[in-house]
């Protein structure tokens, strides 16, 4: 089951794709702004193996893109806004290999350079057993740390509860550890395959990707002042401004 939420109105749709370890809740600020500006509809998804969506037998950018394509196949006017892993998936969808037409992609903060050691470390994480916690507070604190949201999200934020789950063994992250299998996908191939040229954005203080790295792939790179890796959470209004630069066809 691919959990998703929809809002807004109109023909145009924005598919909102979060990053590794996050959930669709990170888009709440941008969703509100899309509604306020009347830009169209939005579809926010918990990626497979995250939040309220079920796990897969295996994980790859292509497999995740195929899952999402089935969700938005009937959308006639589709734009994708993806953060980190979501940016990778957005580029894959924009290839038109999955039977859908994407009119524009905003790729936010994708980590484009992976060392062999980093890839090996991520793949080792994919094989680790689930870690259990004794309380909701403990596991929620851990989630905020591993997702990089510790300073951007208040502990009482409502959507945080969907990032963790409880069963007989105790509390755990809702994320399937095997989702780390996606690390190491060929970014340059995805960029080259995208039919509409992607627009890239990063926070000024993002430690995972530099402006110069993104400029190797596009001349449309926007740096957002005062923000880190989770710029879509920290400064959703800046992201909305970039969305409004697309040829929306109004």
Where in this protein do the model-derived segments appear?
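Catalytic histidine-centered segment of alpha/beta-hydrolase-like enzymes
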Residues: 227-240
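Flexible "cap/lid" loop of the alpha/beta hydrolase fold
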Residues: 92-96, 100-134
């Amino acid at each position: 089951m691919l959990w998703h939420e929809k809002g807004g109105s109109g023909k145009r749709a924005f598919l909102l794709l979060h990053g590794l370890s996050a959930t669709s809740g990170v888009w709440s600020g941008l969703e509100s702004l899309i509604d306020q500006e009347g830009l169209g509809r939005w579809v926010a998804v918990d990626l497979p193996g995250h939040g309220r969506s079920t796990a897969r037998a295996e994980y790859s950018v292509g497999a995740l893109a195929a899952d999402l394509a089935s969700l938005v196949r009937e959308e006639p006017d589709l734009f994708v806004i993806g953060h980190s892993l979501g940016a990778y998936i957005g580029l894959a969808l924009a290839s038109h290999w999955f039977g859908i037409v994407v009119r524009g992609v905003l790729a936010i903060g994708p980590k484009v350079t992976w060392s062999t050691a980093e890839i090996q470390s991520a793949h080792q994480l994919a094989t680790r057993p689930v870690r259990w916690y004794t309380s909701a507070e403990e596991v929620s604190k851990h989630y905020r740390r591993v997702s990089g949201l510790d300073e951007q999200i208040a502990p009482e934020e409502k959507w945080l509860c969907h990032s963790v789950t409880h069963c007989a063994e105790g509390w755990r992250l809702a994320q399937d550890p095997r989702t780390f299998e996606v690390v190491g996908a060929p970014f340059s191939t995805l960029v080259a395959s995208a039919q509409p040229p992607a627009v890239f954005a990063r926070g000024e203080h993002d430690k995972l990707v530099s402006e110069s790295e993104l400029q190797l792939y596009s001349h449309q790179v926007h740096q957002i002042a005062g923000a880190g890796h989770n710029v879509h959470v920290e400064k959703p209004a800046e992201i909305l401004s970039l969305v409004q630069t697309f040829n929306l066809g109004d």
